[in-house]
């Protein structure tokens, strides 16, 4: 695939930024277009530093702007679509989440057909497969097993329907008579440097005597390090453009995890931050069934108040279920078809993430020292 080019949507996000950074190392890549709704000054500076032999073009635009998407896709060989409204708690309106995740994906697929882009990789989520109950056990699941989310919550529903649209679009005829080839990568929880979930957890703990609130004690998950998640996208882009590999990949989805040990989300938070004195809350917490029904009551209150007041519960049944389920996946199919092997070991991922958490702790202490002076 000599002289190829790639558009990355959501390029200012946690995963998108890492994909762009890895793409510039691709020897035969001529141009990367980095599309994001709004880039901060720091993000733009970091992207400008990536200018090597590969041209990096920064594009500001909305995933719901069809004309913007057509311009962004023009002349591209591949699209990696990471842009999404990630909102399991439902803080944004249902329509907003559906528009960004589902309508935006369909508009981008249409733009690919119009602009003759033959390769489309979609960043999906394991939440399209469940878990549908915290009592359900899904252990080392693989693609041949039929797991599908039954939640009506806008985030898992929109991701599920968007993935279906992407896979159904495989084989679409492009405007020039060519063929669109698609695949989807179902990512487990992504951790690593610059993870907003981890950042919020750490900052909240630092304001609470370095105590991390427990909310995921009963889960068993296999999160994926951001560098490995990004690497899977690079391999998918390569493989879909390889005439020998592409036929077995077209229209397929893949679970993407790595060799991070299976553990609860609470244990992961503790492991990554304990070097800096952060520790899990040891106080009593509500039993899981009671917590689940409390979430149901809060959702009911939110529904009843909706005509007069927009009440957003602090947690919901989806979040309680996701954070307290046995829900792990195998990456063997990606290994077989894409040649995927984690680039970064658990030990290295743990060290890099811990060092980054250390910078957050230092920043917090510096701010505290300035206030006390």
UniProtKB/Swiss-Prot annotation:
| One GO biological process term | steroid biosynthetic process
Q: Name one Pfam family in it.
A: 3Beta_HSD
Record's keyword terms, sorted: Acetylation, Endoplasmic reticulum, Lipid metabolism, Membrane, Mitochondrion, NADP, Oxidoreductase, Steroid metabolism, Transmembrane, Transmembrane helix
Q: Please write the reaction equations for the catalytic activity of this protein.
A: a 3beta-hydroxysteroid + NADP(+) = a 3-oxosteroid + NADPH + H(+); 5alpha-androstane-3beta,17beta-diol + NADP(+) = 17beta-hydroxy-5alpha-androstan-3-one + NADPH + H(+)
The EC number(s) given in the record are: 1.1.1.270, 1.1.1.210
Q: Which GO terms describe its cellular component?
A: endoplasmic reticulum membrane; mitochondrial inner membrane; mitochondrion
Tissues expressed in: Kidney (at protein level); found only in the cortex, appears to be associated with the proximal tubules; and a minor expression in testis.
How does the UniProt record describe the way this protein sits in the membrane? Single-pass membrane protein
List membrane-spanning regions. 288-308
In terms of superkingdom, the source organism counts as: Eukaryota
Pathway terms, separated by semicolons: Steroid metabolism
Gene Ontology MF terms in the entry = 3-beta-hydroxysteroid 3-dehydrogenase (NADP+) activity; 5-alpha-androstane-3-beta,17-beta-diol dehydrogenase (NADP+) activity
Q: Where in the cell is it found?
A: Endoplasmic reticulum membrane; Mitochondrion membrane
Q: Which residues carry this modification: N6-acetyllysine?
A: 350
Function noted in UniProt: Catalyzes the conversion of dihydrotestosterone to its inactive form 5alpha-androstanediol, that does not bind androgen receptor/AR. Does not function as an isomerase.
Q: Provide the family line.
A: Belongs to the 3-beta-HSD family.
Task: Quote the protein name from its UniProt record.
Answer: NADPH-dependent 3-keto-steroid reductase Hsd3b4
Q: Give the source species.
A: Mus musculus (Mouse)
């Amino acid at each position: 695939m000599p002289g190829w080019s790639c558009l990355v949507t959501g390029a200012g996000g946690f995963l998108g930024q890492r994909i762009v950074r890895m793409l510039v190392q691709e020897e035969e890549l001529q141009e990367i277009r980095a599309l994001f709704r709004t880039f901060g000054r720091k993000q733009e500076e970091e992207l400008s530093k990536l200018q090597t032999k590969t041209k990096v073009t920064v594009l500001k635009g909305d995933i719901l702007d069809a004309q913007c998407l057509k311009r962004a896709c023009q002349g591209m060989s591949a699209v990696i679509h990471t842009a999404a409204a990630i909102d399991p708690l439902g803080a944004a309106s249902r329509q907003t989440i559906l528009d960004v995740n589902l309508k935006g994906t369909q508009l981008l697929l249409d733009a690919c057909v119009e602009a003759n882009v033959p390769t489309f990789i979609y960043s999906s989520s394991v939440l399209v497969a469940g878990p549908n109950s915290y009592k359900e056990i899904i252990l080392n699941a693989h693609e041949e097993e039929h797991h599908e989310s039954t939640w009506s919550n806008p985030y898992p529903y929109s991701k599920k329907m968007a993935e279906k649209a992407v896979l159904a679009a495989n084989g679409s005829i492009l405007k020039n008579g060519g063929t669109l080839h698609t695949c989807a990568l179902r990512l487990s929880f992504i951790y690593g440097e610059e993870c907003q979930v981890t950042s919020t957890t750490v900052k909240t703990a630092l304001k609470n005597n370095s105590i991390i609130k427990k909310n995921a004690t009963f889960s068993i998950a296999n999160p994926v390090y951001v560098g490995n998640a990004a690497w899977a996208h690079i391999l998918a882009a390569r493989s879909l453009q390889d005439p020998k590999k592409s036929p077995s990949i077209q229209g397929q989805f893949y679970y993407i995890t790595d060799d991070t040990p299976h553990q609860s989300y609470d244990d992961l938070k503790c492991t990554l931050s304990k070097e800096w004195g952060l520790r899990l809350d040891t106080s009593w917490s509500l039993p899981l069934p009671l917590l689940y029904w409390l979430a149901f009551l809060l959702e009911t209150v939110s529904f009843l108040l909706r005509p007069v007041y927009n009440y957003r519960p602090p947690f919901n049944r989806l979040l309680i279920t996701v954070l307290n389920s046995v829900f792990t996946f195998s990456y063997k199919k990606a290994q077989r078809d894409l040649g995927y092997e984690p680039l970064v070991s658990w030990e290295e991922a743990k060290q890099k993430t811990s060092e980054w958490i250390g910078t957050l702790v230092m920043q917090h202490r510096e701010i505290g020292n300035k206030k006390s002076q």
